[in-house]
Amino acid sequence: QMCIRDSYMGMIHQPDPEKKPDMLEGILAIRHMHMRVLQETGFSTADEMLYPENLRYLSDIMSYIAVGARSVENQFHRLVASGCDVPVGLKNPTSGDLTVMLNSVVAAQVPHDFIFRGWEVQCPGNPLSHTILRGAVNKHGQTIPNYHYEDLRLLYELYMKRNLKNPACIVDTNHSNSGKQYMEQIRIAKEVLHSRRHSDDIKNLVKGLMIESYICLLYTSDAA
């Protein structure tokens, strides 16, 4: 019996939105997409760690991983982030709580022993784990941006109160920072760059921007 869903859950579940879900084809599709980017551009890829188990299919070709707002408080995501050998960005939760985000960075930077894929693993900690500001949502469902100068200044001060390695922040110009109005990303990017020019502390903290585009890569199972 097939479960009928109202929303599209992503390529790994349903690589062809017009066909039934197919997890095997989905795994092939996501790997093919990452390989195609690498082959055609020469750039290695970044992706969100929605399911930590999927790392086994992509870890050899990715150079950056993000942990999303709804996963950042999950212990398993934090533990796996501590064992990744590439930079891992941890977003603020949808509540906007910066201390939760920084606690996640702390957890990702220290060593851990835990069970992963049925094995006991020891992770040394990831000194390149860092923060991503993506805005917040209040109890009324209204978006609250956190990319302004004052937000970046506050994050810098919170970083300085903690003994964290390699303080760094990426600003997500979409999601709740733009209210999902994608054209606003241009203005937001310019404002963040202005804040970096205005403050050396912010310049040293903010390492880049996360910009959401709507470029579609088509996948067919016979394109190997």
What are the residue ranges of the model-derived segments?
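Conserved, mostly hydrophobic/aromatic
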Residues: 171
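Redox- and metal-dependent alpha/beta enzyme cores, enriched for Fe-S-associated oxidoreductases
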Residues: 157-160
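Short, structured loop/turn "capping" segments at alpha-beta junctions
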Residues: 165-168
